[in-house]
Structure formats: structure tokens, C-alpha cells
A protein has these predicted regions:
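Catalytic machinery of carbohydrate-active enzymes
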Residues: 1-343
């Protein structure tokens, strides 16, 4: 075996994209052991902590090859049966002349033993371990087409109240209206904190976003279900085979409307926001809205989401909150106005 080739992989896209890149790095080494030394230059460095496949490399090392990582496979996602996880892998194969194959249907994230064995952030707040689901009831302003109406998220929470604790998360500078009856951690978690929350969570409820990718990438806790429950309110923007994971309940409407009759529409916003972003352009705007939100999301009613959660609860014999846990949690739940901004 010759001297390993040194690679620094570059990408500064969103954390969800970078979770896909972690899979590509893993499978580069799984398929070509000892052939490469790899390092990365990306945003969201917390995603790479404890990663066993990285070796610190200097960018000015003349032996290092810098590779800007992309996923052009997305351009044919409506025509090809490929998942987002294949995107960076396909690009590395084309760029490096390799035949990397996906070895696991998920990203590759690594918590420390201390992060896994310690009490969850929720347990630290409540004073005892409580089963909980993460809920993401909003999203980024550049992709408002992914938003589901906040009253529908609230209806799901209300249905499960007293049985399931929902922990609401979301970044401070994104749109995440406050929900009532949840443990409110919006704007209060680092990316690493979020990874720990997902690890300890019983399930995840979200739109198409980072959190569904974390749900698939994070290992599951010993003694729990073999896969982490995740319900995704997806609509019609992306073809389901590009985003969905086999063990998730991915509620989509592709094929139900003229605008997504043959695949995802791939549009960005439901209405223009006037912020100067190119996504205000007509070619990026939803063509079928209901009260300024996309019809493809409007078609998904709370009862459909509730049904998926209930199926997980029964199928995996997931435990509900006990009376004692409910009493301990109650004073910590959010009772502010539902449209309150993130502090």
C-alpha cells in the first residue's frame, strides 16, 4: 500500500447538507481503507467532533488536494431514484475516479461517551428523566414553502398533551412561533446541544429540515427501538425518494397537485418577502397558495400527523409520561402567546 493521498474537503452549506457530507467521508474510508487521509473545511464544525475519519491537515501542505464538494445529482432528482445521501458520494466518485457506495442509510455523527451517558438536557431541567419528542414548528426564511401553519403544529401538541412532552427547538434568527404546552428551547441550543437532544429523544416531528437528518444519523440509545421515530411534514417541494429515510413517516403530497404532479416543484417561497433575496423571483415562488402558505402543505391535516405519531407509539411500545413526570414538567411548559417571538 502506497502513501495515503491527502484530501481536504470543502463545503460551507447548511448543517443539513453537511450531515450528508459526513456520510460521504465515512464511506470514502469504508470503501477505500487506508488510501486517504481526509480533513474538512466546512461550517458547523460541531458536526465533525469525535469523527474517527478525520486527520488534521494543513491547507498549505503541497501534498494536499483541495476538493470543493457538491451534489449535482440534485439536478436530476425528479428523474433518478437517488437519495440526498448519494449526492456528495456521486460527486467524489466523478472527481476522484472512485466507486464509493453508501454503506449506511444515514449520516455519520459521533457523540462522546460523556454526552451519551449523562442526563439529557431535558432531565437536567425537569430533575428526572422524561420521555420527549423534539418538535420543529417553523423554518428558514429562504424556504418558506416548507412551512406548515403554526396552528396545525399546535393541534398536534394539544392532542398529545399530558401523554407526550414536546420540546420545541429552532434557531433564533429563523421563524419558529411559540407553541403552548411545550418545553421551549428555541434559540437556546448550540448545534452540539441539539445533537444531544436528538440522541436522547424518543422521536422527532419536523418539516424537511436538519432535524430529520439528525434523527437518521444519530445512533439510538441502548434498550430503545432499533431506529429513531421521525414524522416529517413534507408537502410537495422535494421528491420523497430524495429526502425520505426508510424508517421515517414522510408525509408528502407529490403527485396530488398539478404543480408537483411529476415530482417535487423545488420552489423556495410561498410569497415574496421583499428582502432582496433572489428567491423572491417568480421562478422561485409557489404557484398555488392558501392563506400565503403552499397548498401542498395545506393538504396535510393534523390528524394525519397524529396518526403517524400514534402508530410509532403503539408499534414501538413507546412509553408515555407518567403522572409524576407530568406534574414535574407542567410548571416548565410554555404558556405564552403563540405568536411570541423568540427571545
Amino acid at each position: 500500500m502506497g502513501t495515503p493521498e491527502k484530501l481536504i474537503l470543502l463545503n460551507y452549506q447548511s448543517p443539513g447538507d453537511l450531515v450528508m457530507l459526513t456520510a460521504a467521508v465515512r464511506d470514502l474510508h469504508q470503501c477505500y481503507p487506508n488510501r486517504f487521509l481526509t480533513d474538512v473545511r466546512t461550517g458547523s464544525p460541531e458536526l465533525w467532533e469525535n469523527n474517527p475519519y478525520l486527520t488534521p491537515l494543513a491547507a498549505d501542505d503541497p501534498e494536499v488536494r483541495m476538493v470543493a464538494c457538491e451534489y449535482p445529482t440534485i439536478q436530476s432528482a425528479n428523474q433518478r431514484p437517488a437519495h440526498f445521501l448519494n449526492g456528495f458520494i456521486d460527486h467524489l466518485n466523478d472527481t476522484l475516479g472512485l466507486r464509493i457506495t453508501l454503506t449506511r442509510f444515514g449520516g455519520d455523527l459521533h457523540l462522546s461517551e460523556a454526552e451519551k451517558s449523562g442526563p439529557s438536557a431535558v432531565a437536567q431541567m425537569v430533575g428526572l428523566e422524561v420521555p420527549y419528542w423534539i418538535i420543529v414548528a417553523g423554518g428558514k426564511y429562504d424556504y418558506t414553502i416548507k412551512w406548515w401553519h403554526f396552528r396545525r403544529w399546535q393541534a398536534v401538541v394539544d392532542h398529545c398533551r399530558g401523554r407526550i412532552l414536546f420540546v420545541q427547538v429552532g434557531e433564533k434568527h429563523h421563524y419558529h412561533p411559540a407553541l403552548e404546552g411545550v418545553l421551549d428551547l428555541r434559540g437556546r441550543t448550540s448545534l452540539r446541544d441539539l445533537m444531544g437532544l436528538v440522541y436522547h429523544a424518543q422521536g422527532v416531528l419536523c418539516p424537511v429540515t436538519l432535524h430529520m437528518h439528525l434523527a437518521a444519523a444519530m445512533e439510538v440509545k441502548p434498550g430503545g427501538p432499533p431506529s429513531r421515530p421521525c414524522v416529517v411534514v413534507a408537502g410537495g417541494r422535494e421528491p420523497p425518494h430524495w429526502e425520505a429515510y426508510p424508517t421515517h413517516q414522510f408525509i408528502h403530497t407529490v403527485g396530488l397537485l398539478p404543480c408537483c404532479a411529476t415530482g417535487g416543484c423545488w420552489r423556495s417561497r410561498s410569497v415574496p418577502l421583499g428582502d432582496g433575496d433572489e428567491k423572491d423571483g417568480a421562478q422561485h415562488l409557489c404557484v398555488d397558495t392558501v392563506n400565503n402558505l403552499p397548498r401542498c402543505m395545506h393538504l396535510i391535516e393534523p390528524r394525519a400527523v397524529i396518526e403517524k405519531i400514534e402508530l410509532y407509539m403503539r408499534g414501538h411500545s413507546l412509553v408515555e409520561m407518567t403522572q409524576e413526570q407530568g406534574v414535574r414538567v407542567a410548571p416548565l411548559l410554555n404558556h405564552r402567546a403563540r405568536l411570541a417571538p423568540v427571545d
